[in-house]
Amino acid sequence: MEIAACHRLQLSYDSPCGGLHGHNWIITVYCKAKKLNADGMVCDFKHIKNAIHGKLDHSNLNEVLGFNPTAENIARWVVQRIPQCYKCKVQESEGNVAIYTSHNNAQADEL
């Protein structure tokens, strides 16, 4: 899914990313289940989109997330937010991609 959002990064070094700037993020969510539900799905994509797109699209990520919104942290947040999600890929621009994978979503690291 595509998200239009702005952020500024809090980094330990000088970077232009410390200033407010925006991206058209592409977020890919990977879900799994031992068995499909009664509808033949792992989960409804609409529920995933509502949980992510509904919260992040056209927002200031620093304000809505409450943590340093690096692509890596956003990917981890998605994995923690969607119970069936085990991996998330966040692309903030072409060539700038972060992937977070949890081998056991229930025990994903806390932010």
Q: How should these model regions be labeled?
A:
Residues 1-111:
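Charge-rich, low-complexity N-terminal segments
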